[in-house]
């Protein structure tokens, strides 16, 4: 009885080990067994859902970030400078017509000339592109513009009407012509000009020519005062060579000569 019982135990042990070994071979690699999968099915589903939510949240964050970057880019384009800050020159434009006038821009949009320079005649000329400049009144904070009818006025915003072509003449004066407005059939340019009374001329007038002094302006810009360069030169003093020291000779007492001669004065009267 004991031997048969032991044989049964041994056979059952072999059968159980073979069955367990077969299950291990049947299960594919990288997948948990039935015990592992059956332990917490809810946990697996929750992990999958959490992964899905994290991926969706990351995609939403990336999309919102890209949208914010796009909004920032458009905002930067909208908030960019309306005129180029390069090549700024601050001063006045002097026209030598009549008694001489300084071009000035008023806050209410009026443009004319004044014989005496004042705060309204302080202008800022800045470069827009090659050969194209803009003129802004420092006090009025408005831009010089020319309408499609050739009238000079001041504009609060910098537009294409505010662009002028700057040319240097042979007499060291400058002319300023509208960059977009001109006489279409002949292609004649419209220039900024003042008359003898200091009033602004229409650029479309046939009398406004680049050869006339009414279109010639002399830029008067403030030049920075150069600091005075001063320096001191120290010349080394030449030291006099020391005089040779004379040897001290002991002074001897004067000796009285033994043969002394005395003379007596004799006075003779009469």
From Swiss-Prot:
Subcellular location: Secreted
Biological role: Plays an important role in the regulation of cell proliferation and cell differentiation. Required for normal regulation of the hair growth cycle. Functions as an inhibitor of hair elongation by promoting progression from anagen, the growth phase of the hair follicle, into catagen the apoptosis-induced regression phase.
Source taxon at top rank: Eukaryota
Glycosylation sites: 112
Compositionally biased spans, kind Low complexity: 43-68
Name of protein: Fibroblast growth factor 5
Family: Belongs to the heparin-binding growth factors family.
GO biological process: fibroblast growth factor receptor signaling pathway; neurogenesis; positive regulation of cell division; positive regulation of cell population proliferation; positive regulation of MAPK cascade; regulation of cell migration
UniProt GO molecular function: fibroblast growth factor receptor binding; growth factor activity
Signal peptide: 1-20
Presence of the UniProt keyword Disulfide bond in the record: no
Gene name for this UniProt entry: FGF5
Ranges where the record places region Disordered: 26-83, 236-257
Keywords carried by this UniProt record: Glycoprotein, Growth factor, Mitogen, Secreted, Signal
Subunit structure: Interacts with FGFR1 and FGFR2. Affinity between fibroblast growth factors (FGFs) and their receptors is increased by heparan sulfate glycosaminoglycans that function as coreceptors.
Bias-annotated ranges (Polar residues): 69-83
Claim: Signal is one of the keywords in the record: yes
GO cellular component: cytoplasm; extracellular space
Ranges annotated as spanning the membrane: none
């Amino acid at each position: 009885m004991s031997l048969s019982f032991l044989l049964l135990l041994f056979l059952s042990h072999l059968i159980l080990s073979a069955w367990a070994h077969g299950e291990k071979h049947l299960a594919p690699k990288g997948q948990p067994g039935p015990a592992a999968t059956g332990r917490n099915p809810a946990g697996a589903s929750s992990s999958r859902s959490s992964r899905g939510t994290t991926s969706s949240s990351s995609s939403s964050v990336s999309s919102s970030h890209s949208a914010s970057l796009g909004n920032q880019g458009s905002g930067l384009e909208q908030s960019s400078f309306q005129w180029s800050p390069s090549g700024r020159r601050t001063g006045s434009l002097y026209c030598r017509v009549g008694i001489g006038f300084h071009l000035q821009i008023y806050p209410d949009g009026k443009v004319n000339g004044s014989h005496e320079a004042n705060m309204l005649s302080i202008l800022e000329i800045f470069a827009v592109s090659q050969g194209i400049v803009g003129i802004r009144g420092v006090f009025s904070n408005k831009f010089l513009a020319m309408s499609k009818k050739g009238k000079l006025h001041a504009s609060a915003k910098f537009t294409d009407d505010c662009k002028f072509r700057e040319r240097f003449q042979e007499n060291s004066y400058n002319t300023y012509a509208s960059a977009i407005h001109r006489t279409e059939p002949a292609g004649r340019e419209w220039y900024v000009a003042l008359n003898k009374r200091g009033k602004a001329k229409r650029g479309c007038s046939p009398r406004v020519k680049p050869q006339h002094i009414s279109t010639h302006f002399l830029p008067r810009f403030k030049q920075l005062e150069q600091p005075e360069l001063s320096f001191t030169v120290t010349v080394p003093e030449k030291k006099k060579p020391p005089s040779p020291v004379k040897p001290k000779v002991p002074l001897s007492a004067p000796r009285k000569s033994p043969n002394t001669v005395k003379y007596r004065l004799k006075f003779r009267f009469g």
